[in-house]
Amino acid sequence: MAVKVYENVVSKDQRKILLDYFKTTDDLVDSRPDVRSKTPVWNQTTNWPQDTVKQILDDIIKLKYDPEWIFFYMLRQYPFRPFPLHVDSGDGDQSKLHKNILIPLDLDGPATTIVFKNKWHGPSTRFGTTNVSPFRYEILNHGGAIQVIEDIRELKDISHLRITQEELDRLIEVRSGKVNQRVTDYTNIEGYDPNIKFDKQIHQQYLSHIPIENLHGLTIDSIIEWKLGDVITFDRQHLHSAGSGHSKKIGLTVTTNVGD
């Protein structure tokens, strides 16, 4: 089964512990206009609730596992965009990849994750047939209007924008990395069929932040509604995206490898 939802396995006390940690400001915080995140490292970072996360994982994973990536995040929906179509496959070593594990922690408005039947057998990447520069960004000005910046590297005056210089510098650094490279040729996506046209109604309701051209040829496996207390799992090779609709949501993603 590609997707499995474990219902009511995370207690209110466990969620509070994880939320309190996420909301604490420390050196791990990465704050940008559209997302705030923290990425502690398993068995290396101190003073984070690893034991709580391990309790949750041990309840749902029955084989030996190694957490590779721990990602706490808060997404703001409007006017920004949810996470795009992507895959969290690490370096792409198929022999070790196990599960994406998603733990909803808090939400404002209907929140969903869309998982596709299609798989990618390469390293982590984003997908889009339209080639958009990673340096194109939307930022609110102080009047509350969206300002489209075609290249944030060329942005010199930020006095009219709701972004600090520190946030801008960090954004440029992140957008310069390999993680922001994207696959525009879908030929090597498992299950891709160029004759399939993506459903317009589903696009409008759940994936309006992604150009529909980027979804043609793909097939949805599951549209998963976020519910507090649940844990969502699926194979790391599966293409997936955050759904549109929420105002704000906070979650924890853990990617695991098969343990030795």
Kindly give the residue locations of the regions a language model identified:
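Non-heme Fe(II)/2-oxoglutarate
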Residues: 1-74, 80-82, 126-186
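Catalytic core of non-heme Fe(II) oxygenases with the double-stranded beta-helix
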Residues: 79-260
